[in-house]
């Protein structure tokens, strides 16, 4: 929904457009690592602040990228649906979303890939997860476990990349 309201051509009101854009800018203004530190100080150590930071920043980026995808959809397709008497919601459902779907999917898959890597970094600040295990292995000089963790991260990223290619080939 934030992407729809942050797109100039689908936002129902200019004030709402600017408010949502500013909220998305705030969410993206700081990297996940900084938001994780903020959330660690608010809720303590563990995986929750890392998840909160990823959700916060991801929402900001997805909202912006999806709004930009919506803003560049083919005007002729949208006008064709509007010419049938379709309202705002029907225009979104039958023109804007189908035209923007390939960009949406590409963006979501990229963000998913990015978040897997970002989750590793968040462990450095005590936000839990595989990043924490990576740091502990380094601190304890447990290089066998360190190599295993790096290999696991590589395998997950590779699987996500292949999954992304399959999805893109079916949709785009």
Predicted ranges, named:
Residues 2-36, 65-68:
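Cytoplasmic-entry segments and transmembrane alpha-helices of multi-pass inner-membrane transporters
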Residues 9-17, 46-47, 103, 142:
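Membrane-helix interface segments
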Residues 18-28, 68-83, 94, 135-139, ...:
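Short amphipathic alpha-helical coupling elements at transmembrane boundaries
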Residues 24-55:
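Generic hydrophobic transmembrane alpha-helix motif, especially the helices
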Residues 30, 34-38, 100, 104-112, ...:
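Hydrophobic alpha-helical segments of membrane proteins
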Residues 41, 113, 118-153, 172:
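Glycine-rich helix-loop "coupling/hinge" segments at transmembrane-helix boundaries
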Residues 45-96, 102-114, 162:
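Membrane-cytosol interface at the C-terminal ends of specific transmembrane alpha-helices
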Residues 106-109, 147-172:
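C-terminal transmembrane helix and the adjacent membrane-cytosol boundary/short C-terminal tail
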């Amino acid at each position: 929904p934030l992407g729809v309201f942050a797109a100039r051509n689908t936002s129902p009101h200019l004030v709402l457009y600017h408010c949502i854009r500013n909220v998305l800018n705030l969410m993206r203004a700081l990297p996940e690592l900084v938001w994780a530190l903020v959330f660690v100080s608010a809720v303590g150590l563990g995986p929750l602040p890392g998840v909160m930071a990823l959700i916060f920043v991801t929402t900001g980026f997805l909202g912006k990228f999806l709004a930009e995808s919506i803003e560049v959809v083919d005007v002729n397709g949208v006008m064709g649906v509007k010419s049938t008497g379709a309202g705002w919601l029907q225009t979104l459902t039958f023109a804007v979303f189908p035209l923007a779907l390939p960009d949406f999917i590409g963006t979501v898959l990229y963000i998913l890939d990015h978040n897997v890597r970002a989750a590793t970094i968040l462990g450095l600040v005590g936000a839990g997860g595989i990043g924490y295990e990576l740091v502990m292995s380094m601190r304890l000089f447990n290089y066998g476990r360190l190599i295993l963790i790096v290999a696991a991260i590589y395998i997950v990223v590779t699987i996500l990349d292949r999954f992304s290619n399959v999805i893109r080939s079916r949709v785009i």
